[in-house]
């Protein structure tokens, strides 16, 4: 398996690359690209870790050499949030970066599974889809917005609040990947019950967890280490699916059946073509249904912004 990380010199990219070097299947190839000249050095640094994963680093304007033959591409390139910024402030810079990188993916590895980490994910995934459509290589089963960070945060916070074994907690998080569009389905968690106040507070904490990190880092960055872990979990799940492993399920922001919006985060079964099946997320509580109804206009507007950017 060949995995390419685009944006590999950044905070998320380096954390993700370190985790993948340690956790990819033996015999895999890890291809690192960033515009920054330090990137080949990041690859050399990682190459000293004794695992059977070969690492190569590429820098400069053109990511194509890093992409040829890639099975999975994870894109974390772009600028990070700073205090006072929301994810939409990132759009002006990151939209162009994602567009350019996905154009190169379309040319160099059109069959690869592409996971978009770069925020605002609600919009950057729509940009990626439009770029792939223009190139004539769009396959909705092969494009993902990586929302796993919302899932691992939900699992962590719920386990802490309820004194549960975090390894056993599973939380589906649906909708999108910013603010009110993040909807953790707390009503469905096995072995945990919440009061109405707890649901409201926990939902808000999960939605605002990114801001919690940005503020705690006091201008020194955003969530890089936890995002690296989340992206690694999702990337490894993509690979398990490609290798034919059964019952690999994750939540991700994908083009599903369009019931709510063109793109929607929901549980999916992964397989040899990426998304094998979009799974039903089950029955919503009254609180969750109200939150869903309240977020859809925001989500649809985020998606439309991406579509119009490429047009």
Swiss-Prot record:
What GO biological process terms does the UniProt entry carry, in alphabetical order? malate metabolic process; tricarboxylic acid cycle
Question: Which residues of the sequence carry a binding annotation for substrate?
Answer: 81, 87, 119, 153
Which catalysed reactions does the entry list for this protein? (S)-malate + NAD(+) = oxaloacetate + NADH + H(+)
Q: Which Gene Ontology terms of cellular component type are present?
A: cytoplasm
The record places the active site at 177 (proton acceptor)
Gene3D superfamilies hit by this protein: Lactate dehydrogenase/glycoside hydrolase, family 4, C-terminal, NAD(P)-binding Rossmann-like Domain
Which leading EC class covers this enzyme? oxidoreductase
Sites where the protein binds NAD(+): 7-13, 34, 94, 117-119, 227
Query: GO: which molecular function terms?
Result: L-malate dehydrogenase (NAD+) activity
InterPro entries on file: L-lactate/malate_DH, Lactate/malate_DH_C, Lactate/malate_DH_N, Lactate_DH/Glyco_Ohase_4_C, Malate_DH_AS, Malate_DH_type1, Malate_DH_type1_bac, NAD(P)-bd_dom_sf
- Family to which this protein belongs: Belongs to the LDH/MDH superfamily. MDH type 1 family.
- Outline what the protein does: Catalyzes the reversible oxidation of malate to oxaloacetate.
Q: How does it assemble?
A: Homodimer.
What is this protein called in UniProt? Malate dehydrogenase
Originating gene: mdh
């Amino acid at each position: 398996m060949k995995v390419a990380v685009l944006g590999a010199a950044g905070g998320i990219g380096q954390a993700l690359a370190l985790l993948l070097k340690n956790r990819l299947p033996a015999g895999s190839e890890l291809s690192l690209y960033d515009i920054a000249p330090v990137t080949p050095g990041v690859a050399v640094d990682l190459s000293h870790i004794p695992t059977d994963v070969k690492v190569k680093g590429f820098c400069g304007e053109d990511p194509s050499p890093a992409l040829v033959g890639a099975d999975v591409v994870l894109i974390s390139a772009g600028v990070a949030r700073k205090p006072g910024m929301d994810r939409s402030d990132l759009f002006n810079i990151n939209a162009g970066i994602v567009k350019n990188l996905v154009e190169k993916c379309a040319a160099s590895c059109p069959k690869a599974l592409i996971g978009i980490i770069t925020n605002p994910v609600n919009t950057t995934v729509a940009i990626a889809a439009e770029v792939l459509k223009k190139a004539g290589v769009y396959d909705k089963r092969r494009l993902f917005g990586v929302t796993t960070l919302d899932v691992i945060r939900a699992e962590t916070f719920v386990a802490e609040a309820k004194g549960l074994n975090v390894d056993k907690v599973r939380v589906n998080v649906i909708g999108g990947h910013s603010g009110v569009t993040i909807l953790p389905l707390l009503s469905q968690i096995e072995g945990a019950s919440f009061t109405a106040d707890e649901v409201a507070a926990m939902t808000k904490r999960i939605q605002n967890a990114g801001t919690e990190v940005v503020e705690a880092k006091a201008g020194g960055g955003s969530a890089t280490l936890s995002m690296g872990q989340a992206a690694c979990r999702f990337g490894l799940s993509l690979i398990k699916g490609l290798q034919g492993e059964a019952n690999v399920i994750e939540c991700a922001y994908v083009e599903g059946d369009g019931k709510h919006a063109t793109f929607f985060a929901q549980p999916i079964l992964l397989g040899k073509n990426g998304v094998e099946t979009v799974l039903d997320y089950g029955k919503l509580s009254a609180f969750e249904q109200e939150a869903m109804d309240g977020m859809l206009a925001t989500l649809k507007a985020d998606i439309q912004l991406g579509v119009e950017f490429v047009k």
